[in-house]
Amino acid sequence: VHPVEADIRKWSHDFLEVPNDKLNGLPPCPYARKAWVDNQVKFSINTGLEGLTEEVKNFETHNYDIVVWASEELPDIEYLDGICDGMNEALSIAGIDMHLMVFHPDFDASDAGLDFLEEDGITSSQLEYCMVFIQRLSILDDAALSLEKSGYYKHFPEDTYNALVLDRRRLRDGNG
């Protein structure tokens, strides 16, 4: 197992899957554990932006719920975010049920106003990498709709909620 994959698995187990009072007692990612148990996570590590493009192109050819593209070579956050935003817009216009979500060490939970989601000390300080999660947009939005009803987003700043939930919903509805 690649060290980055091991680190992501640890982050998921020790943080994403752990209940949080500020999320109405739910874990940051209530669906992560099931994806691991069902072997629904595929990794693409250090394949460059070409590898990310390939994973997007080939997403419909497999049955994984999520592809985690990770890179220890860090593209500029604005550049990576712009690529993924552009892909998300194009996928929405084309009616393709897919969404890319960026995680970058230059923009953490506190930058998004989500201090309660800080995970200091959980991941390796020896590794630095960015990630893009590739998933089905409909499944993400259906999950968000369910989580909204549970009070999950109650402590999210409005601009973060808009970016994470409402902007994604607009893409799903074809109103990018």
Annotated model-derived regions:
Residues 1-176:
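Expand to "…catalyze enediolate/carbanion chemistry for C-C bond making/breaking, isomerization
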